[in-house]
Amino acid sequence: MKALDELTFDNRFARLGDAFSTHVLPEPLDNPRLVAASPGAMALLDLDPAVAETPVFAELFGGHKLWAEAEPRAMVYSGHQFGSYNPQLGDGRGLLLGEVYNQAGEHWDLHLKGAGQTPYSRMGDGRAVLRSSIREFLASEALHALGIPSSRALCVIGSDTPVWREKQERGAMVLRLAPSHVRFGHFEYFYYTKKPEQQKQLGEHVLALHFPECQELPEPYLAMFREIVERNAELIAKWQAYGFCHGVMNTDNMSILGITFDFGPFAFLDDFDAHFICNHSDDQGRYSFSNQVPIGQWNLSALAQALTPFISVEALRESLGLFLPLYQAHYLDLMRRRLGFTQAEDDDQKLVERLLQLMQNSGVDYSLFFRRLGEHAPEQALARLRDDFVDRNGFDAWAELYRERVARDPIQGQDLRRARMHAVNPLYILRNYLAQKAIDAAEAGDYSEVRRLHQVLSRPFEEQPGMDSYAERPPEWGKHLEISCSS
């Protein structure tokens, strides 16, 4: 394990030059202090978890100190926001400190969010508040633990720095890790500003670093785009299967690596609601839960437009046509596993759709239903779940189909069935009300609940003694909370 001063930097994005980013120093927080750190994320940098408790840790990730090898840069990009093109966005409050490579040879971007104003702050103060920083920290690590591709969060640093939003709050910083911070919007920026040389330079950079296997193929850019399509189809399939609503699927928030990026007003479903809108600024429901699949394809089409200098329109259209079949295959595979099936049958999609409609009509808790379905043998589990449904006759009809489907599946024994289902059906998810309780405590100076919640969410599939309250249905006030983009 390494100490903080032993990290090895290799700042490949910074070497692209000033057309891609601007050198900016972090603005330090007043009285920085550790709110929470992720040992799992620290391990990606070979860091000893004990260093999180040292004063220099808070000073580094609170903007007071920098490694000599770090090259803090604010990246420039553009993007489509709620369907409309915004010509220049960029890192308005975050800085790419540099890239660190670990003993396994993996490169990880170190990105400090809430680091102060940059040339791309667009009249903003460049700060992030404590509540949004805690949410990003918890969400990043929770999604990773669920097996959903995501950026990681090394730590949250709190402070006494005053920040004004709807009211005065305290500033904070999050240290985010990702193999790359290149977004769809990076390619859009150089396409729409008509900078073909820089766009080509960006493309070669991304190919060499993140899609090297595509370089050997006859059409490397086309191969790369198809890989991006596949990764995003799989990502969104996992969002839908686990009930995750991102909330702000603008193209500048979409990663070329197909990882969940830029957590804002996200939410996991409580009661199943296909039309749930977690972002209270989304008046039209563009980024509602049910729209995430078509919006994912729309965003890929926006990226495709930016790649027309490298790939024929016909080939791009053909590749975009792969998205929905790929999504459906990944989604159905996940849902079969959540229902306890080990083999595919033609009518599985209808069985899933019928179940979701029944859950929608009755307001059934999405995550708890699947967890409880695997607790007991099908007959007993279905009898216990029946009371959650208003349409008992409809549920009985579905339950009969489910029993018949289970009987045809080759899985043997309830113990094996329970183990397989519990391995894909979490007991603990990051419900918004749990995050809010942790935030309320943290804003009062008590960080223990943030740390406890993080520990619980790091093992979502395992029953943890004494943690029953984290697996309960939310209270009425905690259901379907809409979260502001204000952060």
From Swiss-Prot:
Q: Which residues does the annotation say bind Mg(2+)?
A: 253, 262
> Which keywords, in A-to-Z order, does the entry hold?
ATP-binding, Magnesium, Manganese, Metal-binding, Nucleotide-binding, Nucleotidyltransferase, Transferase
Binding annotation for ATP: 90, 92-93, 113, 125-126, 176, 183, 262
Q: What is its EC number?
A: 2.7.7.-, 2.7.7.108
Among the GO molecular function terms of this UniProt record, one is: magnesium ion binding
Reactions catalysed:
L-seryl-[protein] + ATP = 3-O-(5'-adenylyl)-L-seryl-[protein] + diphosphate; L-threonyl-[protein] + ATP = 3-O-(5'-adenylyl)-L-threonyl-[protein] + diphosphate; L-tyrosyl-[protein] + ATP = O-(5'-adenylyl)-L-tyrosyl-[protein] + diphosphate; L-histidyl-[protein] + UTP = N(tele)-(5'-uridylyl)-L-histidyl-[protein] + diphosphate
Signal peptide limits:
none
Its needed co-factors are: Mg(2+); Mn(2+)
Q: Name one Pfam family in it.
A: SelO
Active-site residues, as the UniProt record annotates them: 252
> What InterPro entries is this protein classified in?
SelO
Q: Does the keyword Transmembrane apply?
A: no
Family per UniProt? Belongs to the SELO family.
Q: What does this protein do?
A: Nucleotidyltransferase involved in the post-translational modification of proteins. It can catalyze the addition of adenosine monophosphate (AMP) or uridine monophosphate (UMP) to a protein, resulting in modifications known as AMPylation and UMPylation.
Q: Known NCBIfam families for this protein?
A: PRK00029.1, PrtAdtaseSelOPseudom
Q: What is this protein called?
A: Protein nucleotidyltransferase YdiU
Q: Which organism is it from?
A: Pseudomonas fluorescens (strain ATCC BAA-477 / NRRL B-23932 / Pf-5)
Q: What is the lineage of its organism?
A: Bacteria, Pseudomonadati, Pseudomonadota, Gammaproteobacteria, Pseudomonadales
